[in-house]
């Protein structure tokens, strides 16, 4: 960045997407400040790295800032945004600051409705194993490094590209991965056709020497391939994909398969993360690593060292034969994939606790949610996590629970108060169960409470 920018302020610095950029900037030597409504492990880590953290949002927090960075969750009526604009301090979206970091490196941007965080984490891990030493900015905690960001010494930056508000169009990556395209964020997009058009625009921003890595198994991605004007490769389980997986096996947490490139066998890949959807994420990673001329044996070694990502089928504990797992899945497609992973890896009763995320998403995808839980033996729903949204009349978790029952799901219970979910679980769980908390809100706390209570039990 131009030398006169010294102090950068983040509104909502504790968010997983904001904190990663802040950490990289701190490591680059910039003075970073930020505000959030509450303390967390994330804000404490940033303080330890030299960040100046304020609790609460007040105009005085931005007095010394040269630029103010906001996420899509921060609105124009935020007092820090108002103060910054009155002082003529530039206010920019998170994606613009990420684009600035990407401008300093060759960018590898992972886009798609689902699988971004896991795929970004896989790419970061495998490239590090190959000595490429990338800078990484991830929307989740990479277990192997204990954080969601790292400043590397290599030429590449690996980051998630967030399509939720179209801001990923600010990025100009060298390699663009599209894991899938699905109907989501319909409070911003008019429908699936606009979403597809936006992804086409994103892909075609790569330079002539760049590469698009596209999932051929996803129908919406396949639809846009004729519109792609840049060099691309494909991956998937279909025989037409350039990078393909065969002989897929799932056993507990271990997933393995044989990788092929254009009909030629590359070798076996094995990693500790369950689910067929993660085979696709791994294939995307292999495509990126191959483009960067990594040896296949280094790719194999990287997958063996992959330790997973926070809130992606993350085991919170196993007590008395009851395994408690948390997952960020909050879209019907993600939910079905996660439940299938649990059923495919273990022959155990599956108790699912789901907290819907946002009223708008629940409304737009209501019928898809109704049919997303058939792999759950027992389903518990709790009230919608609003994520700053106002309620929509008739859109409730209780109504969703009732509709799911009417569609043939036998064991469905609605527990309005999330704080009472743990007590309900204690009354029904038994040895051999997998308890899976699902959602992008705070439902993971119910699973953590359950682990504590089970450990305290005589």
UniProtKB/Swiss-Prot annotation:
State the Pfam families in the record: Mur_ligase, Mur_ligase_C, Mur_ligase_M
Q: Which GO terms describe its molecular function?
A: ATP binding; UDP-N-acetylmuramate-L-alanine ligase activity
What are the record keywords, sorted?
A: ATP-binding, Cell cycle, Cell division, Cell shape, Cell wall biogenesis/degradation, Cytoplasm, Ligase, Nucleotide-binding, Peptidoglycan synthesis
> Which HAMAP family does the record associate with it?
MurC
Which family does the record assign? Belongs to the MurCDEF family.
**Can you name this protein?**
UDP-N-acetylmuramate--L-alanine ligase
What InterPro entries has UniProt attached to this entry? Mur-like_cat_sf, Mur_ligase_C, Mur_ligase_C_dom_sf, Mur_ligase_cen, Mur_ligase_N, MurCDEF_pg_biosynth, UDP-N-AcMur_Ala_ligase_MurC
In terms of superkingdom, the source organism counts as Bacteria
User: What is the source species?
Assistant: Geotalea daltonii (strain DSM 22248 / JCM 15807 / FRC-32)
Compartmental location: Cytoplasm
What job does the chain carry out? Cell wall formation.
Q: Which GO terms describe its biological process?
A: cell division; cell wall organization; peptidoglycan biosynthetic process; regulation of cell shape
> Under which EC number(s) is this enzyme classified?
6.3.2.8
The gene for this chain is murC
The UniProt record gives the binding positions of ATP as 112-118
- State the GO CC annotations: cytoplasm
Biological or metabolic pathway of the protein: Cell wall biogenesis; peptidoglycan biosynthesis
Catalytic reaction annotation: UDP-N-acetyl-alpha-D-muramate + L-alanine + ATP = UDP-N-acetyl-alpha-D-muramoyl-L-alanine + ADP + phosphate + H(+)
């Amino acid at each position: 960045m131009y030398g006169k920018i010294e102090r950068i302020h983040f509104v909502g610095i504790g968010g997983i997407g904001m904190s990663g950029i802040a950490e990289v900037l701190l490591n680059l030597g910039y003075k970073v400040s930020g505000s959030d409504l509450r303390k967390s492990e994330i804000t404490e880590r940033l303080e330890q790295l030299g960040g100046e953290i304020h609790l609460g949002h007040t105009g005085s927090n931005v007095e010394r800032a040269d630029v103010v960075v906001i996420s899509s969750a921060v609105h124009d009526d935020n007092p820090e945004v108002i103060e910054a604009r009155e002082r003529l301090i530039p206010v920019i979206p998170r994606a613009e600051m990420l684009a600035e970091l990407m401008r300093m490196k060759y960018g590898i941007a992972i886009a798609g409705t689902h699988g971004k965080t896991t795929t970004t984490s896989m790419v970061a891990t495998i490239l590090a194993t190959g000595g490429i030493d990338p800078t990484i900015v991830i929307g989740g905690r990479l277990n192997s490094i204990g954080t969601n960001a790292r400043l590397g010494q290599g030429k590449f930056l690996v980051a998630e590209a967030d399509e939720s508000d179209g801001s990923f169009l600010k990025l100009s990556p060298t390699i663009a991965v599209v894991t899938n395209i699905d109907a989501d964020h319909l409070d911003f997009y008019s429908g699936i056709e606009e979403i597809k058009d936006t992804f086409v625009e994103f892909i075609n921003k790569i330079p002539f020497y760049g590469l698009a890595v596209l999932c051929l198994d996803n129908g919406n991605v396949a639809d846009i391939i004729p519109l792609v004007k840049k060099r691309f490769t494909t991956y998937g389980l279909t025989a037409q994909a350039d990078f393909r997986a065969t002989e897929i096996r799932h056993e507990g947490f271990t997933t393995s398969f044989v990788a092929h490139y254009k009909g030629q066998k590359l070798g076996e890949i094995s990693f500790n993360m369950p689910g067929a959807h993660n085979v696709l994420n791994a294939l995307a990673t292999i495509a990126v690593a191959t483009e960067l001329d990594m040896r296949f044996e280094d790719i194999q070694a990287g997958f063996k060292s992959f330790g997973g990502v926070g809130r992606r089928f993350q085991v919170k504990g196993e007590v008395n034969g009851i395994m408690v797992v948390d997952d960020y899945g909050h879209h019907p497609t993600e939910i079905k994939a996660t439940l299938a992973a649990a059923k495919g890896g273990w022959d155990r009763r599956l108790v699912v606790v789901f907290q819907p995320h946002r009223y708008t998403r629940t409304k737009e995808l209501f019928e898809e949610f109704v049919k997303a839980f058939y792999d759950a033996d027992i389903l518990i729903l709790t009230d919608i996590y609003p994520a700053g949204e106002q309620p929509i009349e008739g859109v409730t978790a209780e109504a969703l629970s009732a509709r799911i029952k009417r569609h043939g799901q036998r064991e469905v219970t609605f527990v309005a108060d999330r704080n009472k979910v743990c007590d309900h679980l204690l009354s029904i769980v038994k040895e051999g169960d997998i308890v899976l908390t699902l959602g992008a809100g705070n439902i993971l706390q119910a699973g953590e409470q359950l682990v504590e209570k089970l450990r305290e039990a005589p």
